[in-house]
C-alpha cells in the first residue's frame, strides 16, 4: 500500500509544491485528487466535489496535466484547442494564444510534429487557459530546456488567479522555488512536512557558514563551508526558504511538521 493514514488539506488559493523522491507517490496522489484513481478507504474532496464521483461540474473545474499526456497526433494545436476547449466553460482563447506566443509556438503545427518539451508547452498553455479552479501539474518541467523553464515560471506566475488552487508535483525543486507559496513533502507514504513558506521563513533560518554551527537542525557541505538550517529567533531577519536544503532535511528526518511547529507552540505557552 503506497499511502496509509494519509491526511492532507490545502488552503484554497494556494500554489503548492508537492515534493518527493521518484516513486514516493506524487503522481498517484494527483491521480487520486483528479478522480482517475480511487482510494480503497477514506475520502477525498476538492472543495465541494468528491473526485471519485467524476461529476460534470467537477470535471469542468479541474485540469490534470499528467507527465505523459495522451494526445491525438493528427490534430494541429488549433484543432486541439477547438475540440478540448469546449469542455471548459472558463477557457480563454486569447489567453491561450498569448501563452503559446510566449513559448514561441504556432497553432498550425500538428502535435505529432512537436518534441516532448514542445508538447508539454502546448498542454501547459491549454491548462492555464482553462482557468479551472483546480490545476494539478505532474512534473510539468520534464522535457523543458533551461530557457523554456524560465518561460514556464513566468507564464505560470502571470496566469494564476487568486481563487485558483494549484498543486505542482516535482522532484526538480529549483523549477518551482519561485512559484509556490506552500510546500508539501511526501515520503514513506505520508506527508512529512506541509507548511506555508512564510511560516517556515518565520520559524527557520537558512544560511551559510565557514564552520559547522553547533545549533544547526540540518547542515550540508557547501563549497568550503556549510549551508544549514536552524531555529530563528524573533530578533533575526528572515531569510528565504532554501527548498532543496529543506527537502533534504525532511528526507533525512532532521525536520518535520512536529519538530518545527510543536517548538513554536511550546514557546508560546
Question: For the regions a protein language model found, what residue spans apply to each?
Answer:
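Conserved structural motif at the start of ABC-family nucleotide-binding domains
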Residues: 3-5, 59
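Conserved ABC transporter NBD signature motif
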Residues: 42-53, 57-58
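ABC transporter nucleotide-binding domain
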Residues: 151-230
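Catalytic Walker B motif of ABC-type/P-loop ATPase nucleotide-binding domains
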Residues: 135-139, 144
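ABC-family P-loop ATPase nucleotide-binding domains
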Residues: 60, 64-122
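The feature captures the beta-strand-to-loop junction immediately N-terminal to the Walker
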Residues: 19-21
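Helix-to-loop junction immediately C-terminal to a conserved catalytic motif
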Residues: 34
Amino acid at each position: 500500500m503506497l499511502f496509509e493514514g494519509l491526511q492532507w488539506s490545502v488552503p484554497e488559493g494556494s500554489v503548492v509544491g508537492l515534493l518527493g523522491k521518484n516513486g514516493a507517490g506524487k503522481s498517484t496522489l494527483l491521480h487520486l485528487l483528479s478522480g482517475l484513481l480511487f482510494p480503497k478507504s477514506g475520502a477525498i474532496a476538492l472543495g465541494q466535489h468528491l473526485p471519485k464521483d467524476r461529476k460534470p461540474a467537477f470535471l469542468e473545474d479541474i485540469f490534470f496535466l499528467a507527465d505523459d499526456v495522451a494526445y491525438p497526433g493528427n490534430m494541429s494545436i488549433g484543432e486541439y484547442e477547438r475540440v478540448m476547449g469546449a469542455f471548459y466553460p472558463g477557457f480563454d482563447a486569447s489567453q491561450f494564444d498569448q501563452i503559446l506566443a510566449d513559448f514561441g509556438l504556432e497553432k498550425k503545427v500538428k502535435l505529432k510534429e512537436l518534441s516532448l518539451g514542445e508538447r508539454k508547452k502546448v498542454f501547459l498553455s491549454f491548462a492555464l487557459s482553462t482557468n479551472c479552479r483546480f490545476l494539478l501539474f505532474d512534473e510539468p518541467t520534464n522535457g523543458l530546456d533551461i530557457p523554456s523553464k524560465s518561460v514556464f515560471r513566468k507564464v505560470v506566475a502571470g496566469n494564476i488567479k487568486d481563487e485558483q488552487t494549484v498543486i505542482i508535483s516535482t522532484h526538480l525543486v529549483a523549477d518551482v522555488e519561485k512559484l509556490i507559496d506552500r510546500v508539501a513533502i511526501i515520503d514513506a507514504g505520508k506527508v512529512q512536512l506541509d507548511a506555508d513558506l512564510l511560516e517556515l521563513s518565520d520559524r527557520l533560518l537558512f544560511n551559510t557558514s565557514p564552520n559547522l554551527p553547533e545549533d544547526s537542525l540540518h547542515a550540508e557541505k557547501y563549497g568550503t563551508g556549510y549551508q544549514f538550517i536552524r531555529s530563528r529567533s524573533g530578533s533575526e531577519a528572515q531569510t528565504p526558504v532554501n527548498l532543496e536544503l529543506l527537502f533534504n532535511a525532511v528526507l533525512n528526518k532532521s525536520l518535520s511538521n512536529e519538530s518545527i511547529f510543536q517548538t513554536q507552540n511550546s514557546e508560546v505557552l
